[in-house]
């Protein structure tokens, strides 16, 4: 049983959903991003979704683009990110760790090379944000070869065939997008998603985590009430870093408190 399966099994027994924060590795600096991970885990994060800074993030709104810029300003490279991932894995052996990246980052290392690096660093899953499920074959093959779960986005306007492919090809969890567009806490998650979740369930998809626009505990409660296995929050977490990174101690406290509030909302 892999780490995601163990997590969802444990949460089901506890009658809880998962809360998964997203942050950019290297934001605002590599060392501070390790302290940020510690604060998220201390607040109760069930898993982590982590980004590698990229210069042209098409699915990201201004908040997460800003995180990438801060990471670039602190000279964070992909190699630095893999080194950070290894340190996070060593500290948290049971925590599911996912990467959310763009195809160029994978391609520049050769696809097999990228997934091998993920395996060596202890990464559980990879979501390539700009590769739709219909075009995923080389990425999926490399992921399978190196024991990495492939995460796919179930779009809000996806037809049955797309959702069926997402269900059949995905492992770990399904990234359920609550609305079209780019990431951002400024634009609220579009509910309801029960229909999408039911369709995914019919196709035996991995557990669905709802993302895009999740910034408040009430949205986490609504997602779980709609049948999601949990929720992912990126922009709202990164916004705390953006606002308070000049005062690291205060920032880390705010992050921990935010996660505590969101995690408390996962009780079924």
UniProtKB/Swiss-Prot annotation:
EC numbers: 4.2.1.20
Gene3D superfamilies xref list: Aldolase class I
Pathway(s) served: Amino-acid biosynthesis; L-tryptophan biosynthesis; L-tryptophan from chorismate: step 5/5
CDD domains per UniProt: Tryptophan_synthase_alpha (cd04724)
GO cellular component, one term: cytosol
Protein origin, superkingdom: Bacteria
InterPro entries: Aldolase_TIM (IPR013785), RibuloseP-bd_barrel (IPR011060), Trp_synthase_alpha_AS (IPR018204), Trp_synthase_suA (IPR002028)
Reactions catalysed, as given in the entry: (1S,2R)-1-C-(indol-3-yl)glycerol 3-phosphate + L-serine = D-glyceraldehyde 3-phosphate + L-tryptophan + H2O
MF annotations from Gene Ontology: tryptophan synthase activity
Active-site residues (renumbered): 49 (proton acceptor), 60 (proton acceptor)
Keyword terms: Amino-acid biosynthesis, Aromatic amino acid biosynthesis, Lyase, Tryptophan biosynthesis
Protein family (similarity comment): Belongs to the TrpA family.
Function as written in the Swiss-Prot or TrEMBL entry: The alpha subunit is responsible for the aldol cleavage of indoleglycerol phosphate to indole and glyceraldehyde 3-phosphate.
Binding partners and assembly: Tetramer of two alpha and two beta chains.
Annotated protein name in UniProt: Tryptophan synthase alpha chain
Organism: Aeromonas hydrophila subsp. hydrophila (strain ATCC 7966 / DSM 30187 / BCRC 13018 / CCUG 14551 / JCM 1027 / KCTC 2358 / NCIMB 9240 / NCTC 8049)
Gene field: trpA
């Amino acid at each position: 049983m892999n780490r995601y399966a163990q997590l969802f099994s444990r949460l089901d027994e506890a009658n809880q959903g998962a809360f998964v924060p997203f942050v950019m590795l290297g934001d605002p600096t590599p060392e501070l991003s390790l302290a940020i991970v510690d604060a998220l885990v201390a607040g109760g994060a069930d898993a982590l979704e982590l980004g590698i800074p990229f210069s042209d993030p098409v699915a990201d709104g201004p908040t997460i683009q800003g995180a990438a810029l801060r990471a670039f300003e602190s000279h964070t490279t992909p190699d630095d990110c893999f080194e950070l991932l290894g340190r996070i894995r060593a500290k948290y052996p049971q925590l599911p760790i996912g990467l959310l990246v763009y195809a160029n980052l994978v391609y520049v290392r050769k696809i097999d090379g990228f997934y091998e690096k993920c395996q060596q660093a202890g990464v559980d899953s990879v979501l390539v944000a700009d590769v739709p499920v219909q075009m995923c074959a080389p990425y999926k093959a490399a992921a399978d070869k190196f024991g990495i779960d492939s995460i796919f986005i179930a779009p809000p306007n996806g037809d049955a065939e797309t959702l069926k492919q997402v269900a059949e090809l995905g492992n770990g969890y399904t990234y359920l997008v609550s609305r079209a567009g780019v990431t951002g806490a400024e634009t609220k998650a579009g509910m309801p998603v029960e229909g999408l979740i039911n369709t995914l369930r019919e196709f035996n998809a991995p557990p669905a985590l709802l993302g895009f626009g999740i910034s408040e505990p009430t949205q986490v409660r609504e997602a779980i009430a709609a049948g999601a296995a949990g929720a992912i929050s990126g922009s709202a977490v990164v916004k705390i870093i953006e606002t308070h990174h000049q005062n690291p101690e205060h920032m880390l406290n705010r992050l921990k408190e935010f996660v505590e509030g969101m995690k408390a909302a996962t009780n079924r």
